[in-house]
């Protein structure tokens, strides 16, 4: 199992490849706000663990294992964003909240959250009822 840090890299690499068609060390460093040397070190570890194939100065490609994991991680992130939006979390907090919880939930929990999201997507009246339950509370300091 990849560590939370490895998951962040795999997710970002997958996302870059999906949007740009490639992922360079410099692109990954820019996206994750880390030094290129940190990316190189992690990419070498991900290569060793067979999530990707890395050749110095030539770039990297995800293996089928890495592609499958990257897709699942990106879907997990999007699902958690949807869930937090459905339950009424302030949009300005959603990204940060997802980053804070995504590595601490089991895949079983993620699947159950997916069921809840799907339920509300398929039952707009239930979603209206949930939204009606939301109360305005003063913002709490974090």
Curated annotation (Swiss-Prot):
GO terms for biological process: intracellular manganese ion homeostasis. Residues 1-63 form the HTH dtxR-type domain. It is found in: Cytoplasm. The gene is mntR. This is HTH-type transcriptional regulator MntR. Belongs to the DtxR/MntR family. One of its GO terms (cellular component) is cytoplasm. InterPro entries: DtxR_MntR_Metal-Reg (IPR050536), Fe_dep_repressor (IPR001367), Fe_dep_repressor_sf (IPR036421), HTH_DTXR (IPR022687), HTH_tscrpt_reg_MntR (IPR022897), Iron_dep_repressor (IPR022689), WH-like_DNA-bd_sf (IPR036388), WH_DNA-bd_sf (IPR036390).
């Amino acid at each position: 199992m990849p560590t939370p840090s490895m998951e962040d890299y795999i997710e970002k690499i997958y996302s870059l490849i999906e949007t740009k068609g490639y992922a360079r060390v410099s692109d990954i460093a820019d996206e994750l706000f880390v030094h290129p040397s940190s990316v190189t070190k992690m990419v070498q570890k991900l290569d060793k663990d067979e999530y990707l194939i890395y050749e110095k100065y030539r770039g990297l490609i995800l293996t089928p294992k890495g592609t499958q994991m990257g897709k699942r991680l990106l879907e997990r992130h999007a699902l958690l964003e949807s869930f937090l939006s459905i339950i009424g979390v302030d949009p300005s907090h959603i990204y940060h909240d997802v980053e804070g919880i995504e590595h601490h939930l089991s895949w079983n929990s993620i699947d159950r959250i997916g069921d809840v999201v799907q339920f509300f997507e398929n039952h707009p009246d239930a979603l209206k009822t949930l939204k009606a339950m939301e109360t305005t509370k003063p913002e709490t300091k974090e």
